[in-house]
């Protein structure tokens, strides 16, 4: 009985895997045989990569050459507070093993890669590209060990260079440009999910309104069959 159970489970997984593979092939063919869509997709990915990587590492280089670790950028709203973040975004997992941090930080990158591979929506491509390259920037940043030119006591060993902070929020997390791009990307993805949900809802609603119940159709047919023609009044000819 146990052997039969595992055999059925194996066959089910095999069948479902084949189904997913066939579905994936159809989606890939649909995306990558459309030359116009492919050009737009590649352009979006390259533009997002250029913006995220250039902004992130130019800013990082400027921070490494800073002469002070704290100053107001926008008084009362945004300050520069330089720190080395050994965790993931916004200081999460700060005291964890570096291997665990690298693993957790790589998850959205791997997921983002597969979403980009199968996505056929431009807004989703923008959002996922920002998340992908934002996460990639942080991993690259963490793997580079640099020394601050003028500052001391801040380590870059297995740490991401963080610098932005909101002073009006108590115990506000310190973040950087890659984190910002990840958040913006997630907002784009959320917007696309809402748009898709609304479109599907309207489509389903319109379909229900246009689809007449079978019972009503049968009743209409029966009425048409039993409907009698109007009785013509006999013409009476009066004799003179």
UniProtKB/Swiss-Prot annotation:
Q: State where the protein is found.
A: Cell membrane
Q: Which InterPro entries match?
A: Peptidase_A8
GO biological process terms, alphabetically, are:
proteolysis
Top EC class for this record: hydrolase
Membrane topology of this protein: Multi-pass membrane protein
Q: Which GO molecular function terms does the record list?
A: aspartic-type endopeptidase activity
> What are the EC numbers?
3.4.23.36
Q: Hey, which pathway is this one from?
A: Protein modification; lipoprotein biosynthesis (signal peptide cleavage)
To which protein family does this belong? Belongs to the peptidase A8 family.
Q: What does this protein do?
A: This protein specifically catalyzes the removal of signal peptides from prolipoproteins.
Designated name of the protein: Lipoprotein signal peptidase
Which organism does this record belong to?
A: Malacoplasma penetrans (strain HF-2)
């Amino acid at each position: 009985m146990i052997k039969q159970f595992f055999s059925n489970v194996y066959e089910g997984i095999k069948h479902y895997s084949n189904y997913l593979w066939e579905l994936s092939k159809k989606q890939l063919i649909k995306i990558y045989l459309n030359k116009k869509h492919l050009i737009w997709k590649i352009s979006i990915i390259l533009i997002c990569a250029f913006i995220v990587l250039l902004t992130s590492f130019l800013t990082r280089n400027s921070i490494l050459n800073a002469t002070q670790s704290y100053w107001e950028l926008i008084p009362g709203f945004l300050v520069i507070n330089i720190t080395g973040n050994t965790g993931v975004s916004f200081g999460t997992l700060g005291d964890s093993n570096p291997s665990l941090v690298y693993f957790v930080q790589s998850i959205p990158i791997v997921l983002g890669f597969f979403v980009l591979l199968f996505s056929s929506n431009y807004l989703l491509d923008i959002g996922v590209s920002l998340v992908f390259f934002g996460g990639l920037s942080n991993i690259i940043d963490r793997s580079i060990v640099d020394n601050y030119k003028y500052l001391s006591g801040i380590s870059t060993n297995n740490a991401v260079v963080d610098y932005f902070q909101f002073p009006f929020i108590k115990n506000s997390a310190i973040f950087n440009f890659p984190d910002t791009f990840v958040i913006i990307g997630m907002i784009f993805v959320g917007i696309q999910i809402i748009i898709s949900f609304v479109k599907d809802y309207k489509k389903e609603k319109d379909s229900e309104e246009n689809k007449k119940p079978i019972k009503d159709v049968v009743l209409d047919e029966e009425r048409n069959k039993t409907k009698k023609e109007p009785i013509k009044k006999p013409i009476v000819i009066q004799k003179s």
